[in-house]
């Protein structure tokens, strides 16, 4: 695709229309998948009911919480060296994860009859949301883009990941350390090596979704697609976690009603870290790491763009202390913006890619 695509060319759609298309698409998909699996869409153990309940619940709660966030002066601090179009977003409330993550988690626990697996994943999700909240709060308190130190954030992420892995170790079958490879009848026995991999996946996935949250509606929409697909994939073997995935996907859709372009609220690290942790925890618990890797394609590309940018800059640094850049700005979505894409073009194309990746996993 031509990187110099102008905002007036190609995708010409409003933020509310794009969000509505996604909501209708995911709702229809959930209904279709339930019907194909002989699940009644209005049953608690389905994809459709949790999706719709949480979409409506988080959407309604947002109308109450957003004015409260505004009153508490939780306005986002915008980087001056970022895309100039983002400067007008200064003051938009952040920390929106505090309302849609709890809605998804609570409804998932209720509909699943407080299944042990759902409670464990909910605890991990909430814990990562707490890390994000600490970071968001420090940024707001200091009125800068510096939250808690990277070392502190990483230590907390690793710590909560270790607790979750210990729970897995003592409460799940020993064959959880065997990685199933889809499309072939083969499993990869990792043994003890599974546990450092599990910790890495939890930390990496949460940070990857965090990096993707840089444009109105981008993270909420792409994660909603990934969660629904993951829920559909694990439905036959883990119905409780299917409900959890559908509920959190619905929570993202309800949040998207307020976060679509132009956004009235941002999810902040409170939301993005929690969502990444949720995806990783479900995948570890259901032996779907390969599917997670595919579903998270956008998040990983965004992360790789940052890693490549930093590495190349350091490798080409001259005597003046300045290096060269591979991208105009990282992550990738900001590079596309600076080459002429509008926010809605980036979001629309990323939604389509996320949907294609989901279809590949469900094929």
Swiss-Prot record:
Catalytic activity line of the entry: UDP-N-acetyl-alpha-D-muramoyl-L-alanyl-gamma-D-glutamyl-meso-2,6-diaminopimeloyl-D-alanyl-D-alanine + di-trans,octa-cis-undecaprenyl phosphate = di-trans,octa-cis-undecaprenyl diphospho-N-acetyl-alpha-D-muramoyl-L-alanyl-D-glutamyl-meso-2,6-diaminopimeloyl-D-alanyl-D-alanine + UMP
One GO cellular component term noted in the UniProt record for this chain: plasma membrane
Main localization of the protein described in the UniProt heading: membrane
Pathway noted in the entry: Cell wall biogenesis; peptidoglycan biosynthesis
InterPro entries, per database record: Glycosyl_transferase_4 (IPR000715), PNAcMuramoyl-5peptid_Trfase (IPR003524), PNAcMuramoyl-5peptid_Trfase_CS (IPR018480)
E.C. no: 2.7.8.13
Top-level EC class as recorded in UniProt: transferase
Transmembrane segment boundaries: 13-33, 49-69, 95-115, 119-139, 154-174, 183-203, 224-244, 281-301, 343-363
Subcellular location as annotated: Cell inner membrane
Protein's membrane topology: Multi-pass membrane protein
Any GO BP annotation: peptidoglycan biosynthetic process
Cofactor: Mg(2+)
Record-linked CDD domains: GT_MraY (cd06852)
GO MF annotations, alphabetized: metal ion binding; phospho-N-acetylmuramoyl-pentapeptide-transferase activity; UDP-N-acetylmuramoyl-L-alanyl-D-glutamyl-meso-2,6-diaminopimelyl-D-alanyl-D-alanine:undecaprenyl-phosphate transferase activity
One matching Pfam family: MraY_sig1
Keywords, in A-Z order: Cell cycle, Cell division, Cell inner membrane, Cell membrane, Cell shape, Cell wall biogenesis/degradation, Magnesium, Membrane, Metal-binding, Peptidoglycan synthesis, Transferase, Transmembrane, Transmembrane helix
Family to which this protein belongs: Belongs to the glycosyltransferase 4 family. MraY subfamily.
Main function: Catalyzes the initial step of the lipid cycle reactions in the biosynthesis of the cell wall peptidoglycan: transfers peptidoglycan precursor phospho-MurNAc-pentapeptide from UDP-MurNAc-pentapeptide onto the lipid carrier undecaprenyl phosphate, yielding undecaprenyl-pyrophosphoryl-MurNAc-pentapeptide, known as lipid I.
PANTHER family from the UniProt entry: PHOSPHO-N-ACETYLMURAMOYL-PENTAPEPTIDE-TRANSFERASE, PHOSPHO-N-ACETYLMURAMOYL-PENTAPEPTIDE-TRANSFERASE HOMOLOG
Protein name: Phospho-N-acetylmuramoyl-pentapeptide-transferase
Annotated organism of origin: Nostoc punctiforme (strain ATCC 29133 / PCC 73102)
Taxonomic lineage from the root: Bacteria, Bacillati, Cyanobacteriota, Cyanophyceae, Nostocales
